């Protein structure tokens, strides 16, 4: 959630920055609500003060033997007016809060202005795409020749479209990838491995920004009742990991907090009908190793560079060509202030495809979660800055290996970094 000060003290500039990312802030409507808030807040305070004064006068009048009935009636009337004003103010604040919940984060000044992915800016490339001397197959056809290692037909029978059953060496390779990623991030990059619930409540989804705006993208498994909140399957481990700090005040000495987790992720892919219908690229259920950092405000942009670099290391160790892209204002996620995408080369598509998205959220999520740390200089709690990124999407990494490492005889070479995780197996044979 945006800092209310941005909307109260500099709404025109805030609207301009939001427009750069395609969001139209109704300045007139918000300004009108803000004026009403000021008026009601002032009236509520005046009524409170007046009632306090009158209440004190009752005691004095009673001590002097005066008739206090008129004063009691007056205080009672003021109390009724105060209750009405408080109720009206509460309703107005709820309206303002609802409006504010739908406003995305402000883009950082270093983010290029643009409408969509066509306006993203390439920062760098690593590795050279391989030149093949045979006809390249996509990952679906490659896996079909490897004991039908990616079985979409059976998954469709079991569940429906956009699911997969993995078997044999492909399933082992998928598991090896997740283990390799976790080991790299915990042993080389200083992250703490976490195991988290795959079901979360509405407060958690609100904290990281999925609710209320993106509820249709989620799988909801349990509706809210009088006894408690509903539960939804996690769309990313970012949700449970980041929400660990919800309603907490961390010791500054513990920062930065760096966490990683391997989880399945569940997304309805609402709005993606007809896109990437073949293969693993866009599934309802997919595995991902997530990276989350909780840092001091002054450290967040350096942390973004570091976190992105940690994801890059995985691609480099796997010897997969990729490029690093800075997203434009119109292509960033709802809560992001600045985002880098890492896109891996897929020879069957003859293009780069997203395999990781790394974002600095500033205090946008922390304000929603009330995730804070105690500043040792002021001894007062301040909002944390939160960052997250994929390190990496396991399924898409599997796709990249199957396509980039395929051989003319239908086999696939195992990346050297994964051989120890495959019990020494260097080739997956057809």
Swiss-Prot record:
One of its GO terms (cellular component) is cytoplasm. Consists of two distinct domains, a catalytic core and a N-terminal extension that is involved in tRNA binding. It is an enzyme of class 6 (ligase). L-serine binds at residues 236-238, 290, 390. The keyword Ion transport does not apply. The keyword Nucleus does not apply. Gene3D superfamilies: Bira Bifunctional Protein, Domain 2, Serine-tRNA synthetase, tRNA binding domain. Catalyzes the attachment of serine to tRNA(Ser). Is also able to aminoacylate tRNA(Sec) with serine, to form the misacylated tRNA L-seryl-tRNA(Sec), which will be further converted into selenocysteinyl-tRNA(Sec). PROSITE patterns: AA_TRNA_LIGASE_II. It comes from the Bacteria. Pathway: Aminoacyl-tRNA biosynthesis; selenocysteinyl-tRNA(Sec) biosynthesis; L-seryl-tRNA(Sec) from L-serine and tRNA(Sec): step 1/1. Homodimer. The tRNA molecule binds across the dimer. Its EC number is 6.1.1.11. This is Serine--tRNA ligase. One of its GO terms (biological process) is seryl-tRNA aminoacylation. One of its GO terms (molecular function) is serine-tRNA ligase activity. It holds the Pfam family tRNA-synt_2b.
């Amino acid at each position: 959630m945006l800092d209310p000060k941005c909307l109260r003290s500099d709404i025109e500039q805030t609207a301009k920055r939001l427009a750069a990312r395609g969001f139209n802030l109704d300045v007139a409507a918000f300004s009108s609500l803000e004026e009403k808030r000021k008026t009601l807040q002032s009236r509520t305070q005046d009524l409170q003060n007046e009632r306090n004064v009158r209440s004190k006068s009752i005691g004095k009048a009673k001590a002097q033997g005066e008739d206090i009935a008129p004063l009691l009636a007056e205080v009672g009337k003021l109390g009724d007016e105060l209750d009405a004003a408080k109720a009206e103010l509460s309703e107005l604040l709820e309206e303002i809060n609802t409006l504010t919940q739908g406003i995305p984060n402000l883009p950082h000044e270093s983010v290029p202005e643009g409408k969509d992915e066509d306006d993203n800016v390439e920062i760098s490339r690593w590795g050279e795409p391989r030149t093949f001397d045979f006809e390249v197959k996509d990952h679906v056809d490659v896996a079909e020749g490897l004991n039908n290692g990616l079985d979409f037909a059976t998954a469709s029978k079991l569940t429906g479209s956009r699911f997969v059953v993995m078997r044999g060496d492909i399933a082992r390779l998928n598991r090896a990838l997740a283990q390799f990623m976790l080991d790299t991030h915990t042993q080389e990059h200083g992250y703490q491995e976490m195991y988290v619930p795959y079901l979360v409540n509405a407060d958690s989804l609100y904290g990281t920004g999925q609710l209320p705006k993106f509820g249709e993208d989620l799988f909801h498994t349990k509706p809210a009742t009088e006894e408690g909140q509903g539960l939804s399957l996690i769309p990313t481990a970012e949700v449970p990991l980041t929400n660990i700090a919800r309603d907490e005040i961390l010791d500054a000495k513990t920062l930065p907090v760096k966490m990683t987790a391997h989880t399945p992720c569940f997304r309805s892919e609402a709005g993606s009908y007809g896109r990437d219908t073949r293969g693993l690229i866009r599934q309802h259920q997919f595995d991902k190793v997530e990276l989350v950092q909780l840092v001091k405000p002054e450290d967040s942009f350096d942390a973004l560079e570091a976190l992105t670099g940690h994801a890059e290391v995985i691609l480099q160790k796997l010897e997969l060509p990729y490029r690093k892209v800075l997203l434009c204002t119109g292509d960033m996620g709802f809560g992001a202030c600045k985002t880098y995408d890492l896109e891996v080369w897929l020879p069957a598509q003859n293009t780069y495809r997203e395999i990781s998205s790394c974002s600095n959220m500033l205090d946008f999520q922390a304000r929603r979660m009330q995730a804070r740390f105690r500043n040792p200089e002021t001894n007062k709690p301040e909002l944390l800055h939160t960052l997250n990124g994929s390190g990496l999407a396991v399924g898409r990494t599997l796709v990249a290996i199957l396509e980039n490492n395929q051989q003319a005889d239908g086999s696939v070479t195992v990346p050297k970094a994964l051989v120890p995780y495959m019990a020494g197996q260097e080739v997956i044979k057809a």
